[in-house]
Amino acid sequence: ASYGLPIERPILEGLMRCAGADASKVEFVDVGFDAFPALVAGRADIIWIFEGWDGIQAQLKGIELNLVRLYGSCIPDYYTPLIISGEETLKKRGDLVRRFLAATARGFEYAAAHPEESAQILLKHSPESDPKLVNASQAWLGPRYKDDAPRWGFQKAEVWTQFADWMYEQKLLEKKIDPARAFTNDYLPK
């Protein structure tokens, strides 16, 4: 089961090929953005999850998962989620974009440094959320917000190139793209 995004099936098929499995024997089911209940209810045998939320949820419920990483030797790494802007906005309102990204970076840096406090802020604005899940998720996510980047939001051209080339090979892109036109670090805080 997956969220139904066009990129998911080629990634899952690629993982299966690398493992020597036959993807044609799998029924792909779109369960929307709440895949975990489909697994628990037995409507799916395999689900695409966000480890920092669904994986934590499984752990809290005592459900053991066998995780297969989406990227590595078979599927190139890629950036997700992304903040996207139009070129015209960047040209005409670049200062606004810089301030927005600086504020966003401060928020992520605060969340990484203060996981308990940031979880409480989220719960204040999303009281329907499960406090145990929010706190455990934030504790797991905190050290990963920046990952191996020198600063929050920083992206590498080679990651874009490798994944774009893979997408082209999978016929998800009609033509190759120039990574320099796909992203920029120019608006990030220094």
Where are these regions (language model features)?
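Helix N-cap/coil-helix junction residues
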Residues: 21-23, 63, 128-129, 172-173
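Residue-level "edge-of-site" marker
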Residues: 29, 52, 71, 180-181
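Residue-level signal for threonine
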Residues: 86, 156, 184-185
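Conserved C-terminal helix/tail region of periplasmic/extracytoplasmic solute-binding proteins
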Residues: 160-190
